[in-house]
Amino acid sequence: MNTTVSNQTPRIRIFDTTLRDGEQSPGCSMTPQQKLVMARALDELGVDIIETGFPASSHSDREAVAMMGRELRRPTLAVLSRCLQADIETSAKALETAANPRLHVFLSTSPLHREHKLRMSREQVLESVHRHVTLARGYIDDVEFSAEDATRTEEDFLAEVTRVAIAAGATTINLPDTVGFTTPEEIRGMFSRLIASVEGADKVIFSAHCHNDLGLAVANSLAAIEGGARQVECTINGIGERAGNCALEEITMALKVRGAFYNIDSAINTPRIVSTSQLLQRLVGMPVQRNKAVVGGNAFAHESGIHQHGMLRHRGTYEIMRPEDVGWESSQMVLGRHSGRAAVEQRLRALGYLLEEEEVKLVFEQFKALCEKQRVVTDADLQALMQDATVQEGYRLASMTISDVGSRANALVELSDPEGNRVAETAQGNGPVDALFGALASATGVKLELDSYQVHSVGIGADARGEASLSVRHDGVEYEGTGTSKDIIEASALAWLDVANRLLRQRERGVVAGKTAAVA
């Protein structure tokens, strides 16, 4: 499907409230300096309006707003204010450094809030809206009014509140689904009817601010756009009060991917989405779940064999957007118990192995057996499987025993030779590895001069394995080999045998020795 939109496509304004509503999420508070760092990222992301804070609530918020105002000159910087004169005056003062300031005033309108929170009548609410929007407009030309709990407000009264706010000078009307109560059909109809019927609606921007209590924040925001909203309020990673807000990464990519359907776009620089998401995760210490849309670790990961096979044929079979479009480097083929042979073979090719049919079959059988022991198979695991497959033509490690003999070590190794016979040898050395390599040299008849030897861990947690890497010389020629095992001494033996077996195969085939590197 064609997801592109023309240059004449209408544009939605993205109002990011990560630094205000998002920060209200428990555990997500930020210092003024952290807010400035996040605001810079939102600016680079292309956000149109950044809600910077609630100045009347704290000195910290006032400081953060002033810092952002001095530095960020492109986006509109908004601050939240209750319908109180002192709040509005404080907010206006906090915005004095901003190049493009916006005062965002709000008042509850639903019967539940009027009765139990405000203790105000309809008439008192209307009077307060008129008075405080007028006051705000006296300070700043760009004024947004939010009818808190709009989706639980009687629609006739909501229409009257909207009319009064527009008449008083509001330039944006926000109709929030404050508690995530509404449904897409309801909010689409609400926006459509109010925009069609309220006097002056054609002179302002209508905005949606949807919470995620029922998991519908993005769906409701999209429906509001269908109903005529031209601003969406959202947060990075969907953080916010309770279950959070409409997620910026989800709403913007929905509009981009389904551009032919919505025929509306945003100015978001989508390749910066993932880095912005990860920055927020670091700042507030709240990681997103792996299956989070767009920015989760599994968003572009495929393990199912059927899905992997389709992806190898054409990525569009199981991906509706490119990972590069949102800032991921590429899709991930996660190798695990659900993976098929095609994905394993493709990954082996990427690691540099060109296998015959029988070799692929053997490695895949070993791969499936390994999947019964651990959840994910890494590249190092595949390399270890390749080692097992390739050494079958040469010596194989049957057993080994390492023991201390005073200040020295003793190694006993038992190998299976290419004909299947058992060969056992012992050797002493200055340490377990020195003794081990001496015993292997005696058993195989191959003499190797060790240049370097390294060990490190590969994999994660209980699935971690030890990898041994060595560089050796034989007849003046350098060789490299690796071995992987749960036991690091065994990994060292496998690395040594990797080189020895290749040397023996070269000797049998009459291959002239030269520098070679093995990944096994």
Swiss-Prot record:
GO terms for biological process: L-leucine biosynthetic process. Signal peptide: none annotated. Mn(2+) binds at residues 21, 209, 211, 245. Pathway: Amino-acid biosynthesis; L-leucine biosynthesis; L-leucine from 3-methyl-2-oxobutanoate: step 1/4. GO terms for cellular component: cytosol. It catalyses: 3-methyl-2-oxobutanoate + acetyl-CoA + H2O = (2S)-2-isopropylmalate + CoA + H(+). Residues 396-520 are annotated as: Regulatory domain. Gene3D superfamilies: 1.10.238.260, 3.30.160.270, Aldolase class I (3.20.20.70). It is found in: Cytoplasm. Its cofactor is Mn(2+). Residues 12-274 form the Pyruvate carboxyltransferase domain. GO terms for molecular function: 2-isopropylmalate synthase activity; acetyl-CoA C-acetyltransferase activity; manganese ion binding. Keywords: Amino-acid biosynthesis, Branched-chain amino acid biosynthesis, Cytoplasm, Leucine biosynthesis, Manganese, Metal-binding, Transferase. Its EC number is 2.3.3.13. HAMAP family: LeuA_type1 (MF_01025). Belongs to the alpha-IPM synthase/homocitrate synthase family. LeuA type 1 subfamily. Homodimer. Catalyzes the condensation of the acetyl group of acetyl-CoA with 3-methyl-2-oxobutanoate (2-ketoisovalerate) to form 3-carboxy-3-hydroxy-4-methylpentanoate (2-isopropylmalate). This is 2-isopropylmalate synthase. The lineage of its organism: Bacteria, Pseudomonadati, Pseudomonadota, Gammaproteobacteria, Lysobacterales.
